[in-house]
């Protein structure tokens, strides 16, 4: 009896490597919401896959699947089992492996989104893992958040300040937050958003396209 024949693994047909976009930020800031909106806003033009990080569950993967952000096979949940920061920075091997596995499944992916687990303002992505980093904070944390600094706020490629609609409810002054953000980030860009209302999502997409050279 002849041995079964299997199709050779698919090979990438596109010239440029996939763009890896890391999305970080504190718990509840809106990382998963941003990822959902980016997938829905870009999936018609680009081949997308997404990787989510949680400590003990795959809850964010489940939420994105239920929301219909992408087909289920294109969303991979990673259980880090420890500090979320470690899994994206000091020892990113679990996420690097996840990226590799997704690219075996979808070799022509244009963008790999990697959402970190909720962490503090010191969280950053390893350059081995992410080409672009987006850091999400929210107005509900108070107008003081931008001036607290930390690598996520000062060094990320794009800072997203989410939940601007809550400013009157928490006594936050958006002009003060914007001014403090410019002081902390210098020329680095930021976007004020209300992601649930899709306010600011187009600006984030434009940033990814321009900075990631997707429009060339």
Swiss-Prot record:
Transmembrane feature ranges: none
A GO molecular-function annotation: nickel cation binding
Alphabetical UniProt keywords: Chaperone, Cytoplasm, GTP-binding, Nickel insertion, Nucleotide-binding
Positions that bind GTP: 25-32
One CC-aspect GO term: cytoplasm
Extent of the signal sequence: none
UniProt xrefs under InterPro entries: CobW/HypB/UreG_nucleotide-bd, P-loop_NTPase, UreG
GO biological process, one term: urea catabolic process
Keyword DNA damage: no
Gene3D superfamilies the UniProt entry points to: P-loop containing nucleotide triphosphate hydrolases
Predominant place of localization: cytoplasm
Disulphides: none
Keyword Chaperone applies: yes
Cellular localisation: Cytoplasm
Protein origin, superkingdom: Bacteria
Its job: Facilitates the functional incorporation of the urease nickel metallocenter. This process requires GTP hydrolysis, probably effectuated by UreG.
Subunit structure: Homodimer. UreD, UreF and UreG form a complex that acts as a GTP-hydrolysis-dependent molecular chaperone, activating the urease apoprotein by helping to assemble the nickel containing metallocenter of UreC. The UreE protein probably delivers the nickel.
Family, as annotated: Belongs to the SIMIBI class G3E GTPase family. UreG subfamily.
Protein name, as recorded: Urease accessory protein UreG
Protein species of origin: Burkholderia pseudomallei (strain 1710b)
Originating gene: ureG
